[in-house]
Amino acid sequence: MKDLLGFLKKQNVSSDFDTIKVTLASPEKIRSWSFGEVKKPETINYRTFKPERDGLFCAKIFGPIRDYECLCGKYKRLKHRGVICEKCGVEVTQSKVRRERMGHIDLATSVAHIWFLKSLPSRIGLMLDMTLKEIEAVLYFEAFMVVDPGLTPLEPWQLLSEEEYLDAMDEYGDEFEAQMGAEAIKKMLQAIDLDAEATRLREEMEATSSETKQKKISKRLKLIDSFVQSGNKPEWMILDVLPVLPPELRPLVPLDGGRFATSDLNDLYRRVINRNNRLKRLLDLMAPDIIVRNEKRMLQESVDSMLDNGRRGRAVTGTNKRQLKSLADMIKGKQGRFRQNLLGKRVDYSGRSVIVVGPSLRLHQCGLPKKMALELFKPFIFSKLQKRGLATTIKAAKKMVEQGLPEVWDVLDEVIREHPVLLNRAPTLHRLGIQAFEPVLIEGKAINLHPLVCSAFNADFDGDQMAVHVPLSLEAQLEARTLMMSTNNLLSPANGDPIIVPSQDVVLGLYYITREKINAKGEGKAFSNWMEVQRALDAKAVHVHTKIKLKIEETVIDDAGVETVKKGIVDTTVGRALLLRILPKGLGFDLLNLNLTKKNISKALNACYRILGPKETVIFADQLMYAGFKWSTLAGLSFCSDDMLIPDDKAPIIERADEQVTEIQRQFAQGLVTEGERYNKVVDIWSHTNELVTKSMMEELQYETVTDAEGNEVKQTSFNSVYMMADSGARGSVAQMRQLGGMRGLMAKPDGSIIETPITANFREGLNVLQYFISTHGARKGLADTALKTANSGYLTRRLVDVAQDVVVTEPDCGTDASITMAPHVEGGEVVEELKERILGRVVAEDVAGLDGEIIVEKGTLLDERLVNLIDESGVDAVKVHSPITCETKFGICQKCYGRDLARGHMVNLGEAVGVMAAQSIGEPGTQLTMRTFHIGGTASASTAQSQVEVKHEGKVKFDNLKTIKNTENQVVVTSRSGEISILDSLGREKERYKIPYGSMLNVKDGIDVTSGNVLATWDAHTHPIITEAEGIIQFGNFDGAVEEHVDELTGLTTHVVKSSKERSSATKELRPYIQLVDDKGEVVPFPGTQTPAMYYLPENSVVVVNQSDKVGAGDILARIPQESSKTKDITGGLPRVADLFEARVPKEPAIMAEVSGVVGFGKETKGKQRLVITQDSGEQHETLIPKWRSVDVFEGERVEKGDVVVDGNPNPHDILRLLGVERLTKYIVDEVQDVYRLQGVRINDKHIETVVRQMLRKVEVRSTGDTSLIKGEQAEFARVLEMNEKVSDEGSVEASYQRVLLGITKASLATESFISAASFQETTRVLTEAAVSGKEDKLVGLKENVIVGRLIPAGTGFAYHKARKEASEKTQRELAAFMNTDDESAVQEEVVEETISVTESVEQTTE
């Protein structure tokens, strides 16, 4: 048995651990680390440069300076290893022990550890239930603490000031004991009985009902519990012994010129030792109390600054007024241990150089300069030369390489064959920023890069540099080839579209040869194959753009993989016919038989990838690139200033605008419009003018008139170079062409507001001085923005990666039935993202049935392009799919809930790090987003005041949740608040959807057909009507003093306006005017179908449009409430908006939502607030207080559902989660984030955002504890609570209840289970303090922790390794358990030994 345990012990090498635990160090522990006490502040002798004995660099304590050599030189050489020199006391061993041997300082008095004192919340303060101020008063010798009151009336632990202490001494003499400093605090901490205290707090928690008290108690209880569980003792937060860092980690290096550079820590240690020695001497001399006290305070301060300089009081500075770097500073921040050395290391076998274009390379190649290759592959070359017998020793080989003999180059050729290298361009924003290529040796000093991978690297050739890395081991080479090769990364992980797409001159060349020209040379000829066309072109019988007829015979493969042979004659052009040569077999000619713009090329490549697979796609992409370069060279497109056409009607358009502006200025001068209206109108006019000029310019640019073969004049698409460049997608856009040939338009000031005088000139005409000055205004802001944006975007990416890093695909199926519903994404009434795009690559959670009820797709199927098209054609408009949000896997996520791996086009593999992929996909386009906050003004405000809904597509009308009544004029009036109208196409799919506001007039009936341009409904955009649903006679109530009459001078009509409460007298302040309906007999009329009397309360400022005793019918308007223009808030756009969403920030003025479902009423108002009361069906009432200045969107007697918005504003995500649940929250965040990215034309798949939201929802708040060990009100990990509940429900006990909590990404990262990961992210001090106090264990499950401890990450190829290790250790434990439980020991013993040996071998193999 002993042998066996010994054997197992041997296996437990220090590098083979599964968890890392951090706890408080006891004084004994610190002494056990130490190799001796540091007694003197001296470092080295200034003459001999040898370390001083007992000093900070003492060789006796820390080990020898030179390998195997003692300090005095008595023992030298390896043979004396382990001897301790009797003269100088140094052990003869390797000098590297100076990196690991620690020393210690025995402190003359106890000192508090600043981290546990000042890192909020103060742990010492929580433990003692005292405030930080009180503790600091004791620690820094400003107050006494009663340690033992004896028989005096003083309280134990009472604080006494100096005077009070002296008074007490006079009164009671020596009957009591009071102390100051850390000793007093230490005594107090020692006196705490943790178990008894915990029990007392638990009882107190049950007894109290006050929320604040409960919170306070739970905080303390948590701390005490963590002390009990971790085995830490509270008094260890006070130090008696200070450990001293090994000297090599705080080096002292001689500079030339006889000076020394030293680590700041040495200075800090010196101060501590000096003060400690002085204090010891003072204590020996029995110095007066006040001197000793002062020295103790100074010692406390010097230990504080050594541990964390600047945390308390002024930071200690060195000679050059620079703050000294303390121990805490060593580990935190970008330059700290975590981020500088553990997460980012420098590597050997790497180099960097400028990149230049390599148009003749193939996609998997890169050009590597010979010089670089020779340097990078040196060790390989040496070994090859030796193997060949060309060199006898490494030294000889080295010489050969230095001389540059011809044999060396031959060997180099052999070495690099099939040996991939990695190319990386900083900043590496997503995983495509590092890719593997096969090197091709080239002359020169620049790396040649294949043009098609530029978009993945975001590289251009204006002086960019790239780094080269050599994968050394066989495994590394294998991974580089199979996973990182550029030919294996054709699709973007963000959206699944091809990322290897031609751009710029390649696109231009392809576009050029696929254009057609009317009446070009040889038009109408017929050819039997592309070779004939080539010969005709060579013979100059036809032109590249000539329209011809071509006989084709091709094999076409469709989505389902079915081959069909197509024959026939097609109309095409010479250029397109030539492209037939490179078209892969299986694709139809119709993919290339059109103008090849960038979009069309992308479509062709996508089709090729889906139908023929990656290999064909790579070849096709390369061939397209060669053709594009060839033809853009032959075309020689360039442009001159005459190509930028200025439209003839530009001048009259601008004149008209000037007249309109003058007219508005005149109205303003007469006081007819306000300053704001004038500004908005002017900006509107100029925006509109700019559009008109652009439109007219584009019409001139886009078409040119030519004569066809019959001699008629016809229009054809223009061959203007500028237009061709923009139309093909090679370079430039309409916006840029507008500035060249139209007008520059309105400019913005740096604060985002628009300057109302536009630049009417364009760049071809040239700008005058004023216009030039205005344009520099905006341009400078643009440059400043870009710099800020890069930093902000990088920080967002960092936070996203940190929160999502440990989401890895860990199992095939979590077995959940939960799902989310996917529907087309509608914005502004139009479908911006179709259903088929949203569900592609998802797994369906329920059978999908067509309109006729037959099942199209079965539950659990992964949707590919074919199935998605099937669903689309069958007219299904919503599909339930699995999502990362609903996945129930405890650690990580399952394949089924994630679906397709976008970068590979098939089901995601086990071990795929989908979290990091999600974070990179969201973060990478961050730099393309805008930074500005939009002030609504000008064009934006014009679009907000909508007053009707127009149909855009023809189709069938469908009402959704609409309540309507007919009024006396037979118009249909809408009386619902959340009603919508959809337009369905012939298959019943939703094409458009519109919200129809309360009080609109409907022009259509449910189910009728409409065509585009039909108006569905109209309403007044500036007022909100109150509409009667019953008919009867008007009777006013509470009008006296609360309502004033206005008589219109022109018409003589009277209207009643409700006064605001500020304008009323105190007697009428509380009155609430209302209108009620009575019948002929004076009885009150009820609402139709109810017993409730028809009363309409009138809010402030509403204008009553009926008079006393008027007769009204259902659907008539009683009053109008003017809508304030308070809706023009600033819209946060771009990057800040995305950051706000992911940080789950509460908006400035959040929308207030109904907490329960029921009927709205208003209660008694307070001074600044109105009281909204919702009465539930059960009769219970729920009250909400709303500030007076917020406009309430609902009216008395109206029914609301839980989660409906009652006060307008930006929704608060926490409210959405609480009231509407996880799915609605996910939908909100996904839609909002997508809106920002869509505005910039960036496509990101929803599931990336869902993955991040999943991580934001990791925590729950415990509502009731049940029979678990949780504490009420604490935040716990969702997976852990589920696990505990499973455990107690199996035992038949009560489960804990909880509520999901939404955390922002920064908070979620810091709240992760792994303290190593959290500490390396932000707030290192706080995280480590907390971890140490609670004795946290890091199970090393995430990626980051494993990188930090230098392991393979548990993802990708490391996933299998970790799995094997886990299984092996589980097996060993099982065997050991069985072994302990059996009687027949010897038999099992042999078995276990064999098992263990085989298990360890298998682990070793996996590691290798």
Curated annotation (Swiss-Prot):
- Lyase as a keyword? no
Q: What GO MF terms are annotated?
A: DNA binding; DNA-directed RNA polymerase activity; magnesium ion binding; zinc ion binding
Protein EC: 2.7.7.6
Keywords tagged on the record: DNA-directed RNA polymerase, Magnesium, Metal-binding, Nucleotidyltransferase, Transcription, Transferase, Zinc
> Which branch of life, at top level?
Bacteria
Positions binding Mg(2+) in this chain are 460, 462, 464
A Gene Ontology cellular-component term: DNA-directed RNA polymerase complex
Q: Which positions are annotated as binding Zn(2+) 2?
A: 814, 887, 894, 897
The note on cofactor binding and number reads: Binds 1 Mg(2+) ion per subunit. Binds 2 Zn(2+) ions per subunit.
> Which residues does Zn(2+) 1 bind?
70, 72, 85, 88
What function does this protein fulfil? DNA-dependent RNA polymerase catalyzes the transcription of DNA into RNA using the four ribonucleoside triphosphates as substrates.
**Family of the protein in this entry:** Belongs to the RNA polymerase beta' chain family.
Protein name per the record:
DNA-directed RNA polymerase subunit beta'
What is the protein's species of origin?
A: Hydrogenovibrio crunogenus (strain DSM 25203 / XCL-2)
